[in-house]
Amino acid sequence: MTREDVIEVLAALESGGIDYWVDGGWGIDALVGQQTRTHRDLDLGVRLDDVAKIETLLPRFQRVSEEEWPGFLLLKDKRGRAVDLLLVERSEGGQLWQQLAAGRRVHHAESETRASGYIGGRPVHCASVALQREHHDHPDATDQDRVDIKVLERKLRGDAEAVG
C-alpha cells in the first residue's frame, strides 16, 4: 500500500463518517511523521458495526479472509492492495474491546486509539505509542515488528533530545 493508496482509503472512510485509527506499520509511520518502509497492507481499527458501511465505501475491496472474524477482517482489491480491519465494539463504560479466537477478549482504552499522527502531511488518528508497543512486542512478534518498534524508539529519543 502506497501513501497515496492509504490517503485514498482514509478519504473514502471519512466521506462516510467512519471513525477509525491507523495501526500497524502505517500507524508507526504516522507517529513518526514520515514513511519509513514499504507496506503490504493498511491496518485500521474500526467499529464492528461499521463493516457493512465500510464495504460500501470501498467497493473495489472484497472480503478475502474471515478466519479471524469477528476480531479481524481482511479486504483486498484486484490490484493487490490490502486493508486489514481490527474490529472493536464499545462497552458501556467506554472501553473498546475486540473478540478474539476461543472467546478471548482484548480491551483498549479509547484514548489509546486517538494519538495524533501524519501520513503524507495529512493528520490522522493512530494507535498510541503504548498501544503500538503492545501490538508489536509479544512472543509471536516478527522481525518487521521489532524493526518498527526500533524506528519508533529512535524517533522518541530524537524528540526527547531535541527538547532536552
Feature annotation, model-predicted:
Residues 1-164:
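Compositionally biased terminal segments of proteins
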